[in-house]
Design a protein with these regions (language model features):
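Active-site cavity-forming subdomains of large catalytic enzyme subunits
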Residues: 1-6, 31-45, 78-84
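Core alpha/beta catalytic barrel or barrel-like domain that forms the active/cofactor pocket
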Residues: 1-29, 46-73, 88-107, 124-145
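Composition- and surface-driven signal marking solvent-exposed, interaction-prone regions
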Residues: 34-35, 76-77, 102, 112-114, ...
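Generic recognition of well-ordered alpha-helical segments
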Residues: 41, 87, 120-124
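Non-catalytic terminal/interface segments that mediate subunit docking, oligomerization
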Residues: 71, 77-86, 96, 185-189
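Conserved phosphate-binding loops in nucleotide/dinucleotide-binding enzymes
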Residues: 73-82, 109-115, 149-150
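Flexible, glycine-rich loop/tail regions that form catalytic "lids" or insertion modules at the edges
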Residues: 111-112, 120-123, 127-189
């Protein structure tokens, strides 16, 4: 955003066209809060940091994919439950589009049956669960609100760290995000 604005573009000319890709993992409550925090932070950044006036610039548009890394080969049918919970967290967090992994992807390419179940998972959530009837079904939940606030605070601190390095381009030049990705990958393993 900063580079585009420095080049003379108006934030409201490009921000409404930006979209993002997220992954959703197994911690249901944390994942819902993550998406809610992302939406709040995006609106804040667009309004307060970049001065966006168009309400569409304040809206975070994002696609979500369930986390293939969470799928297990030993009992692949249990992955149906994992994917369902992840998909539900994404929907309750406000995703605009969703990809649900097939339960057998830990073993290789998905079978036709597994792909059909992944599709039916989305259809049941959208058409039978009732959660899509609400804009923010979990808004007001103490647990969700507290987690959302914690995530917003941590992300704000992280953004401040990047700003202190001179912005994202400078941070990349210094290897900061690369080191962070390596560190988190090591911790995850």
């Amino acid at each position: 955003g900063e580079a585009a604005i420095a080049a003379g573009l108006d934030v409201d000319d490009f921000a409404p066209r930006l979209s993002f890709f997220f992954n959703v993992h197994n911690n249901f409550m944390e994942e819902v809060a993550k998406f809610r925090a992302a939406r709040t932070l995006w609106a804040w950044i667009m309004k307060d940091k970049f001065g966006a006036k168009n309400p569409k610039s304040h809206m975070l548009r994002f696609h979500t994919q369930t986390a293939g890394v969470t799928l297990q080969a030993q009992q692949p049918l249990v992955n149906v439950v994992r994917v369902t919970l992840q998909a539900l967290a994404a929907v309750l967090g406000g995703t605009q589009s969703l990809h649900t992994n097939s339960y057998d992807e830990a073993l290789g390419l998905p079978t036709e049956e597994a792909a059909r179940i992944a599709l039916r998972t989305q259809q049941v959530i959208a058409n039978e669960s009732g959660v899509a009837d609400f804009i923010d079904a979990l808004g007001g939940s103490w647990a969700i609100e507290a987690l959302t606030e914690q995530i917003e605070t941590k992300v704000g601190q992280y953004f401040a760290k990047i700003d202190a390095l001179g912005g994202m381009v400078k941070a990349i030049e210094q290897g900061f995000p690369q080191k962070e990705i390596e560190r988190r990958a090591y911790e995850h393993q």
